[in-house]
């Protein structure tokens, strides 16, 4: 049997099926594109789910993939076993071939058997198969194609060999292929009491989708039968490399050996498990970050944080005191970056996120471990750690519950889950009460009461700029009132419906006017509470307003239009950032104002000037193309079917708004937008900056505000031209000449200062103060460059063998200290020590330097009056 590398196994599988007319489909993101029911892609068929159900058509009916997959949440949570068993992983690759109404059982079995025995050269006597106990058709094909007798075809009655997509939908029997590692390894055949051993390992699973489950009692034949298969790359490689543990294959060993070279701990004993955990979790963390997941305390981000912190704890066990994971990333990119180019594209970003998270957790890890050690000192095997302590570790020290359990695993100590969950619920309740009790607490509670009594506010603003609405609540000074009578009173107004957009999704709220038969009201802002109550922030301008009255609500159309153009530009910008900076870019926050937009993204380094220019060009090209902006209300289900992104963890109403801009962007969005991209006019980035680790902020303007910006810049340019008496064609030359002349003048001034500070030996003898046989020159000089002072002081100490020079200069409440000592006396007087002591005396943090020359700082100018006394004391003691 030939020995294959991991890369060769993957390549041969794909090449084999491509040669058999299968289309090679690239791996999808770990984040399911259209499936809020899944946290992560956990199998090869996920990206084809809609194809299997008939909701989507592809230009091919046979496919082959190598799909990156992750199981570390929900029912597929293998985290606690990873590193300790031979085959559990968080991240793994699933090889698969698929048929959508083309071939079925016989051909699928033939393809599998031929690949395994001819291409991979597996011994036939090492292979066994299972079939569903009623699937005689599959059994007969195994006999025909593989020549198996009944004793090598194992019939399984359980649902392990019958797959379904859910309570209803496509389903069918499975056939699994097992490899026998040999009798020297414990384990029994599938279906026996010893089946959980490691001797017989499943290497391939084939699902024959031939039925549709109508309800729990009704199952019918599908008119179009399909094939879904999965082969774990790591398992198959282990077989082909003659090892029984996935962590012993070449890919993992490369990472493990690379790690050993850094931490310098032998791969043996308990350390072996830590190396395996780190290798697995490095892959999972890196691929998740590459696909846009950032460590956080909720959703996918929290799963990533759990994985990373488990790896960090094992790095700590290996004695690694500094961040480790990011140092291993280059090896992973080298091993897998060619197959998954997203790793290469996002390498610097992944590296920065790994390092930042490790630094963050290092600060609490040791303290948390100390607490855990103290709390478990009296616990023995079979005991239980209290839920309160587990929660404290989670809440105070950032220990995910499964990390605490992992630490206690070897001691056979469990955690009181029930009490832990009670503590979690209590915290959520405290948070809710705290929220209700913070700020305008009385008003906060009112939103719950209003929603319970009146329900949600109906938003009319997608189609109407003004509408007749009924006043249902008025709030003044945090209290519900029946009417508002005092002119210029500020209050909150809620109506049954409104064309005013309440601030949400980053878009600021509308402004405008409300008119009733007796009043005129200015709306200065519109807010949204509890996700669905639209609240108008108002000022009474004329008359009075009462609950129950009808009024005409009219938005400021110009203000709304400016919001529209900046919101639509944000969508285009997001799409272009993906193209220019990479697929790792995810939205971390946004603000859509009438005069500008702000967009925060995950990106670990500054966006270059060249990238900014390219982004602007691409956004403006899409604007000029004048694509239609289709804003459609539909059900969430229909939106997802059309390909709109459904974000995991987001709660959507039964009706959502899908915003489509040509072929550029398709997003679920509740905001307001232009009708065509050309309505935006133009786009200009005004600033780019860092706001947090791994997060950049882009600000931009659109339409008339670009023109305004250009006019301001043009006006500034003309003012500069006028001041410098030049024109724009010669401006750069003029400025460069001025800068060059300024440098020359600075050098000349430096010479003047040096000459002014220079003293002859006779002048030194005359001006210096004698202290215990050494000469001291001290001077305080306003606003002089440190470089000049350093040079001047050093020049003097070279002229006289027993001289100490101390210069202090002040600028904006900051003091700079320069100390120079003649080299002949540096055995007794150290410039660094003198500078440090003076710095501390003047409120600085100390300083230092060479024995003959040192500089330091201070900020207490008031103590300068006593500085000579301090100097005398220092030199007398010396």
Curated annotation (Swiss-Prot):
Q: Which reaction does it catalyse?
A: tRNA(Ala) + L-alanine + ATP = L-alanyl-tRNA(Ala) + AMP + diphosphate
**Keyword hit for Protein biosynthesis:** yes
Q: Which cofactor does it need?
A: Zn(2+)
Single Gene Ontology BP term? negative regulation of DNA-templated transcription
* Name of the protein in its database record: Alanine--tRNA ligase
The subcellular localization recorded is: Cytoplasm
Q: Which residues bind Zn(2+)?
A: 567, 571, 669, 673
Molecular-function GO terms, alphabetical: alanine-tRNA ligase activity; aminoacyl-tRNA deacylase activity; ATP binding; tRNA binding; zinc ion binding
Q: What is the originating organism of this protein? A: Rickettsia felis (strain ATCC VR-1525 / URRWXCal2)
Domain of life of the native organism: Bacteria
């Amino acid at each position: 049997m030939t020995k294959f590398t991991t890369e060769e196994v993957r390549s041969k599988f794909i090449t084999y099926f491509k040669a058999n007319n299968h289309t090679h489909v690239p791996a999808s993101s770990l984040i399911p594109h259209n499936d809020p029911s899944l946290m992560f892609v956990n199998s090869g068929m996920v990206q084809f789910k809609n194809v299997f159900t008939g909701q989507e058509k592809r230009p091919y009916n046979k496919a082959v993939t190598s799909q990156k997959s992750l199981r570390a949440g929900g029912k597929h949570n293998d985290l606690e076993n990873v590193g300790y068993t031979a085959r559990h992983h968080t991240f793994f690759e699933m090889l698969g071939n698929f048929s959508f109404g083309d071939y079925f059982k016989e051909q699928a079995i033939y393809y599998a058997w031929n690949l395994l025995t001819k291409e991979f050269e597996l011994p036939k006597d090492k292979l066994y198969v299972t079939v569903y106990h009623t699937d005689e058709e599959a059994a007969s094909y195994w006999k025909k194609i593989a020549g198996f007798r009944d004793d090598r075809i194992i019939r399984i009655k359980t649902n392990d060999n019958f797959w379904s997509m859910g309570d209803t939908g496509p389903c069918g029997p499975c056939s699994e292929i097992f490899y026998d590692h040999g009798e020297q390894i414990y384990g029994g055949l599938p279906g026996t009491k010893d089946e959980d051993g490691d001797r017989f390992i499943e290497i391939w699973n084939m699902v024959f989708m031939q039925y549709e489950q109508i309800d729990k009692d009704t199952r019918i034949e599908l008119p179009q039968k399909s094939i879904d298969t999965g082969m774990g790359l790591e398992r198959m490689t282990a077989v082909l490399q003659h090892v029984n543990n996935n962590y012993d294959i070449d890919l993992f060993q490369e990472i493990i050996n690379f790690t050993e070279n850094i931490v310098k701990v032998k791969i043996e004993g308990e350390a072996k498990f830590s190396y395996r955990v780190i290798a697995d979790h490095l892959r999972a963390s890196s691929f998740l970050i590459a696909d846009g997941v950032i460590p956080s305390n909720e959703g996918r981000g929290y799963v990533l944080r759990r994985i990373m912190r488990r790896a960090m704890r094992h790095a700590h066990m290996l004695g690694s005191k500094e961040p480790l994971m990011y140092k291993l990333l280059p090896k992973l990119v080298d091993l897998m970056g060619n197959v998954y180019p997203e790793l290469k594209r996002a390498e610097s970003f992944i590296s920065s996120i790994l390092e930042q998270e490790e630094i963050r957790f290092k600060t609490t890890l040791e303290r948390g471990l100390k607490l855990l050690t103290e709390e478990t000192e009296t616990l023995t095997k079979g005991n239980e750690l209290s839920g309160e302590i587990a929660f404290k570790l989670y809440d105070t020290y950032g220990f995910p519950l499964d990390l605490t359990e992992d630490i206690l695993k070897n001691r056979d100590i469990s955690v009181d889950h029930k009490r832990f969950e009670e503590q979690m619920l209590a915290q959520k309740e405290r948070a809710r009460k705290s929220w209700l009790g913070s700020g305008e607490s009385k008003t906060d509670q009112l939103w719950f009461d209003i929603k319970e009594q009146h329900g949600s506010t109906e938003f009319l603003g997608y189609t109407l700029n003004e509408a007749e609405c009924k006043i249902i609540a008025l709030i003044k000074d945090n209290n519900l009132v029946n009417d508002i009578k005092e002119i210029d009173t500020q209050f909150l107004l809620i109506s049954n419906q409104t064309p005013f957009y309440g601030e949400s999704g980053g878009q600021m709220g509308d402004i405008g006017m409300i008119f009733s038969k007796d009043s005129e009201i200015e709306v200065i802002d519109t807010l949204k509470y509890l996700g669905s109550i639209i609240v108008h922030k108002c000022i009474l301008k004329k008359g009075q307003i009462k609950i129950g009255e009808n009024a005409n609500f009219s938005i400021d159309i110009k203000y709304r239009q400016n919001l529209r153009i900046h919101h639509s530009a944000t969508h285009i910008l997001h799409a272009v950032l993906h193209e220019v900076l990479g697929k790792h870019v995810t939205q971390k926050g946004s603000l859509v104002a009438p005069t500008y937009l702000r967009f925060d993204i995950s990106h670990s380094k500054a966006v270059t000037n060249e990238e900014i220019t390219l982004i602007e060009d691409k956004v403006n090209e899409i604007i000029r193309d004048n694509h239609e902006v289709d804003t459609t209300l539909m059900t969430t289900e229909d939106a997802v079917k059309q390909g709109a992104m459904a974000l995991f963890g987001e709660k959507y109403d039964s009706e959502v708004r899908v915003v489509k801009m040509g072929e550029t962007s398709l997003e679920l969005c509740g905001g307001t937008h232009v009708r065509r991209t050309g309505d935006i006019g133009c786009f200009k980035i005004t600033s780019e900056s860092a706001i947090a680790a791994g997060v950049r902020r882009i600000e931009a303007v659109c339409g008339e505000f670009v023109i305004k910006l250009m006019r301001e810049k043009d006006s500034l340019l003309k003012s500069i031209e006028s001041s410098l008496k030049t024109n724009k064609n010669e401006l750069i030359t003029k400025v460069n000449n001025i800068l060059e002349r300024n440098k020359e003048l600075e050098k000349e001034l430096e010479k003047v200062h040096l000459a002014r500070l220079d003293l002859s030996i006779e002048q030194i003898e005359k001006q210096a103060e004698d202290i215990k046989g050494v000469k001291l020159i001290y001077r305080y000089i306003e606003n002089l460059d440190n470089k000049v002072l350093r040079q001047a002081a050093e020049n003097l100490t070279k002229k006289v063998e027993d001289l100490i020079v101390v210069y202090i200069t002040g600028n904006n409440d900051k003091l700079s200290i320069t100390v120079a000592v003649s080299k002949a006396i540096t055995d007794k007087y150290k410039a660094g020590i003198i500078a440090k002591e003076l710095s501390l005396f003047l409120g600085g943090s100390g300083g230092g330097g060479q024995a003959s020359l040192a500089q330091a700082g201070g900020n207490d100018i008031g103590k300068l009056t006593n500085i000579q006394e301090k100097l005398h004391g220092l030199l007398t003691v010396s």
